[in-house]
């Protein structure tokens, strides 16, 4: 039998760039199941948000070493949700491969903020209660190292409009697919088919759902917190609706 010649990955074909706590782990799972995709040896490689990597001549082999030899038709992807939020990442990715495709999942920013805080509490990294944390966020992240700042950026990560705008400054609209988390969750098969089509691939023949790795919630978000956050996000949600042609009424109070 003839063996297909395998090649070394020299450029990634796509990246799942965000947003954190918006279904990216599940999307990574389904992408990795596709026979024509490799997602490398780990989720969240964090190459393009590592300032030390870009302080001198960039060695992209440090990225590509995470990928096996692949068939000519295999696409290589990464899933690092912090890239959407980390300001230098878009330009760094464009310099690396201006033809790359980007996938972005966006969740109701109010729910995303609470899920983010809950994850930090679960990991033992967050001493503050949620309302205290979101009210003190600006002070906490001001001047903090990037890794620490984004760890506690519960609100700031939810201002999606300017983050998506930053991607579109570098990449053409047909190379950036933005998906609502709620649609991905409720219409998973159809949404996945659309994502694979965007990548130029056939859909998976069968879609077995990923077992959810649910972090138990310490408590529920109260109404005061929900109103406070929605008032912060309302203008940005409206801007996102206009930019993407979305209906985000399910994100509103």
Regions found by a protein language model. Give the residues of each.
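PAPS-dependent sulfotransferase catalytic core
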Residues: 1-85, 95-100, 105, 109-145, ...
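Short, conserved clusters of charged catalytic residues that mark active-site
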Residues: 12, 58, 85-88, 159-162, ...
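Generic structural signal for well-ordered alpha-helices
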Residues: 60-64, 90, 164-165, 237
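Surface-exposed cleft-lining segments at the edges of enzyme active sites
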Residues: 81, 142-156, 212-225
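Acidic, metal-coordinating catalytic cores used for nucleic-acid/nucleotide bond scission
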Residues: 81-85, 156-157, 183-187
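Distinct, well-ordered alpha-helical segments
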Residues: 88-93, 191
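Short, surface-exposed basic-aromatic patches at helix termini and helix-loop junctions that form
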Residues: 93-95, 197
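The conserved 3'-phosphoadenosine-5'-phosphosulfate
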Residues: 165-253
